Amino acid sequence: MKQALRVAFGFLMLWAAVLHAEVRIEITQGVDSARPIGVVPFQWAGQGAAPEDVGGIVAADLRNSGKFNPLDRSRLPQQPTSAQEVQPAAWSALGIDAVVVGQVTSNPDGSYQVAYQLVDTGGAPGTTLAQGSFKVTKQYLRYAAHAASDAVFEKLTGIKGAFRTRIAYVVQKNGGQFPYELRVSDYDGYNQFLVHRSSQPLMSPAWSPDGSKLAYVTFESGRSALVVQTLANGAVRQIASFPQHNGAPAFSPDGSKLAFALSKTGSLNLYVMDLGSGQIRQVTNGRSNNTEPSWFPDSQNLAFTSDQAGRPQVYKVNINGGTPQRITWEGSQNQDADVSADGKTMVMVSSAGGQQHIAKQDLEAGGVQVLSSTFLDETPSLAPNGTMVIYSSSQGMGSVLNLVSTDGRFKARLPATDGQVKSPAWSPYL
């Protein structure tokens, strides 16, 4: 695990400039109806104060998923420091059937040992359901906490946790030589660092499926251009810089292709590049505007936005040819879809009754659920496990990032401290 921790973040931290003006989650709608769980402050064994509140990070992760409602620390019936000290009856009396305990120990070499145990207090009282231990340096303590959260989440839900993922987003600052910045942070806004800064707009970041690259749009040459940047060394590869519009990049799940929109022939149309050969082929062709591609898991089909019926709606097309099929019918218009990793659902920007919100559509049954309640919501991006969505919305004269669980129960805001934040993109598993 120690090696995995180093590999996952080492390549990012080699060159990136860490920023101090970070975004932070502010809860706007809680999860009182979610499954209650106990998360006890982790025992600290070392000099002075604990370097991180690991237990607090685990509790926040579980709350952010929308599936759990951690008991407030002031209401904990006991504060056990190990699985053996957990008294199941004290917790089950509060309706809690699982408790997380843990320990953080300072090692002589300056590293830390982070251990956790998930204890059953319901069905099989006192049974340890999951446990783990990680040896990490100080800078990876939050990552170790997220690793514990992932394990607990998966054990209790059967769904792989996505708390060790990251988000990319664009920040527009007021003034300065380089007011546009592409940044990456942990999913919860911590450990933010700079990927690229520019005097001209940056747009539409998109992750490669292995998390090693970001595609995005830049206007630094005087017109739009699509580029792919390798995070480990900052190397930039230009993909497209045709006359007029070059935008909306999306890597295929198998990593072999990049879809994007070009208007070099007049109307916006979809194209796909084979990243190995560099060959580009046109997917859609017509007078309508076709843009915002999102891949289905087979790497052969795309969801995309088209105005061929008059107003923007989401369609599906095979990249090898065929007639696009419309897949959204509710509301006045739907656009900017993001298809889940299993291909069963998608999130999108849906407009109805003068409101523009983030909605989720079941691609098998067709049902639509509005998830957000903020203002002028746009650019939704799903977590790789499909349980959370990050998106941008308008607030005052600027824009901020928001988080909502895909069941709509948990909502939070990630306010920036030094500029407008937009165009979020959730990373794959790292």
Swiss-Prot record:
<comment type="function">
    <text>Part of the Tol-Pal system, which plays a role in outer membrane invagination during cell division and is important for maintaining outer membrane integrity. TolB occupies a key intermediary position in the Tol-Pal system because it communicates directly with both membrane-embedded components, Pal in the outer membrane and TolA in the inner membrane.</text>
</comment>
<dbReference type="InterPro" id="IPR007195">
    <property type="entry name" value="TolB_N"/>
</dbReference>
<dbReference type="GO" id="GO:0017038">
    <property type="term" value="P:protein import"/>
</dbReference>
<keyword id="KW-0132">Cell division</keyword>
<dbReference type="InterPro" id="IPR011042">
    <property type="entry name" value="6-blade_b-propeller_TolB-like"/>
</dbReference>
<dbReference type="GO" id="GO:0051301">
    <property type="term" value="P:cell division"/>
</dbReference>
<keyword id="KW-0574">Periplasm</keyword>
<dbReference type="InterPro" id="IPR011659">
    <property type="entry name" value="PD40"/>
</dbReference>
<dbReference type="Pfam" id="PF07676">
    <property type="entry name" value="PD40"/>
</dbReference>
<comment type="subunit">
    <text>The Tol-Pal system is composed of five core proteins: the inner membrane proteins TolA, TolQ and TolR, the periplasmic protein TolB and the outer membrane protein Pal. They form a network linking the inner and outer membranes and the peptidoglycan layer.</text>
</comment>
<keyword id="KW-0732">Signal</keyword>
<dbReference type="GO" id="GO:0042597">
    <property type="term" value="C:periplasmic space"/>
</dbReference>
<comment type="similarity">
    <text>Belongs to the TolB family.</text>
</comment>
<protein>
    <recommendedName>
        <fullName>Tol-Pal system protein TolB</fullName>
    </recommendedName>
</protein>
<keyword id="KW-0131">Cell cycle</keyword>
<dbReference type="Pfam" id="PF04052">
    <property type="entry name" value="TolB_N"/>
</dbReference>
<dbReference type="InterPro" id="IPR014167">
    <property type="entry name" value="Tol-Pal_TolB"/>
</dbReference>
<feature type="signal peptide">
    <location>
        <begin position="1"/>
        <end position="21"/>
    </location>
</feature>
